[in-house]
Amino acid sequence: MADSSFDVVSKVDRQEVDNALNQAAKELSTRFDFRGTDTTIAWKGEEAIEIVSSTEERVKAAVDVFKEKLVRRDISMKAFDAGDPQPSGKTYKVNGTIKEGITSEQAKKITKIIRDEGPKGVKAQIQGDEIRVSSKKRDDLQTVISLLKQADLEVALQFVNYR
């Protein structure tokens, strides 16, 4: 019997992030407490999001609105990294980034968790920014998935290519 396997990846659906950003921008333009604060939220490059407002409290509230929209679109908070409010002239800015991919350090940590706490016979191989987990038994793979979901990792994980 052939081995069963799946891949552990950390990817974010850019369209869902864009939808969350547009929803947040619409809410910021219509909410009463943001009137007159010139609060904007927009993409800055491919992976960065810039939130600008006239006061530090309003920029923090705008970040909270954006995070709420991300959660509603089923995007993990681990995938969004918001910086601290920075004064920029008469306004305050927050630069946030969308984190994708598993670094080699995180991949080593994940494979160590699988090796130490997972069932016997399960193999984990690092392949670039993803990890291939294989085993003869599908039940062992299900155990590894639940183990990784319970682990406290600083990266949002998805499980794809389940064969």
UniProtKB/Swiss-Prot annotation:
Keyword field: Nucleotide-binding
KW NADP (keyword) present: no
Keyword Nucleus applies: no
CDD domains in the record: YajQ_like
UniProt cross-references to NCBIfam families, sorted A to Z: PRK05412.1 (NF003819)
General function of this protein: Nucleotide-binding protein.
Protein name per Swiss-Prot or TrEMBL: Nucleotide-binding protein Mmcs_0777
